[in-house]
Amino acid sequence: MAAETASGYIQHHLQNLTYGQLPDGSWGFAHSAAEAKAMGFWAFHLDTLGWSVALGLIFLFIFRMAAKKATSGQPGGLQNFVEVMVDFVNGSVKDSFHGRSPVIAPLALTIFVWVFLMNAVDLVPVDWIPQLAILISGDPHIPFRAVSTTDPNATLAMAFCVFALIIFYSIKVKGLGGFIGELTLHPFGSKNIFVQILLIPVNFLLEFVTLIAKPISLALRLFGNMYAGELVFILIAVMFGSGLLWLSGLGVVLQWAWAVFHILIITLQAFIFMMLTIVYLSMAHEDNH
C-alpha cells in the first residue's frame, strides 16, 4: 500500500500520473495532488494518455486480425465475435440515425469498443496496476490511475470531438445560415419582424445552452459513473486491508459481487455514450429544427 492511512491510500489511487513543470521550474512527475495542481493547465496525465492509446491499438489489432482471417467458410470464434459486434452497432445506427453518412457506423463501433475497453480496466484489482507502476519506476510514492474514463480530461476530450462533428455536420447539411438560424430563430418565433429580432438573444441563449449541454452531459455521465464505480472498488480494498478478519471476508464477497454488477455498468455506459453520439449526429443531419 503506497499510503499508510486509509485516506492517503484513497487519494493515492485517485491521483493521475501527472507530468509537467514543477514550482522550481524543472519538469517532472507530481507526487501529490498539490504538486499536480501547481503544474497548471499544461500538465499531462500520462497514465490516461498511455492507456487510451494502448487500448485503441488493441482494438485495431483485434479487428484487423479478424478481418484478415475472415473466410466465407466456417468462421472462427474471433470472427464470430467481431461480426456480432459489427451487426449490433450497425443495427443501432440504422434504428437511430436518419441521415446518410458512411462514417457514422464505423465511428459508433469505434466509440463503443474503445470506451468499453477503457471501462473494462476497472475490473482489474485496484492495487495490481499501481503496484506494477511502482515496481517499474522504483518510486514507492508515484501514483498511477489505469481507468482512463475516471479522468474527466479523457471523457471531455471524447465528448468535444463528438461536439465538433455535431457542428461540422450541422453546417454541412443546413449551411452556415441555416445553422445560425437554428440557434437564433427557435424555439420562439413571430411573424412580426421586429418581435422576431427582439427574440433573437433569448433564442440564442436557450439554444446555445442546449447545444453546449450535449458534450458536457455526455462526458460527465461517463466520468461520474466510472469514477463512482472505481471509488467503490477502492473502498472495498480499504475494507479488505483493514486487518479485521470479518471485514476482510466481507470485502472478498463485496469485491466479487460489485465486479459482477460492474460488468453491466461498463457495458451500459459504453452503449449510452455510443447511442447519444448517434442521436446527436442524427439531429445534426436533420434539416428542420
From Swiss-Prot:
Membrane topology: Multi-pass membrane protein
Keyword Secreted assigned: no
GO function terms (MF aspect): proton-transporting ATP synthase activity, rotational mechanism
Subunit and partners: F-type ATPases have 2 components, CF(1) - the catalytic core - and CF(0) - the membrane proton channel. CF(1) has five subunits: alpha(3), beta(3), gamma(1), delta(1), epsilon(1). CF(0) has three main subunits: a(1), b(2) and c(9-12). The alpha and beta chains form an alternating ring which encloses part of the gamma chain. CF(1) is attached to CF(0) by a central stalk formed by the gamma and epsilon chains, while a peripheral stalk is formed by the delta and b chains.
Membrane-crossing residue ranges in chain numbering: 43-63, 103-123, 160-180, 193-213, 232-252, 259-279
GO cellular component, one term: plasma membrane
CDD domains in UniProt: ATP-synt_Fo_a_6
Function according to Swiss-Prot or TrEMBL: Key component of the proton channel; it plays a direct role in the translocation of protons across the membrane.
InterPro entries: ATP_syn_F0_a_bact/chloroplast, ATP_synth_F0_asu, ATP_synth_F0_asu_AS, F0_ATP_A_sf
GO aspect biological process, one term: proton motive force-driven plasma membrane ATP synthesis
Protein name, per record: ATP synthase subunit a
Annotated family: Belongs to the ATPase A chain family.
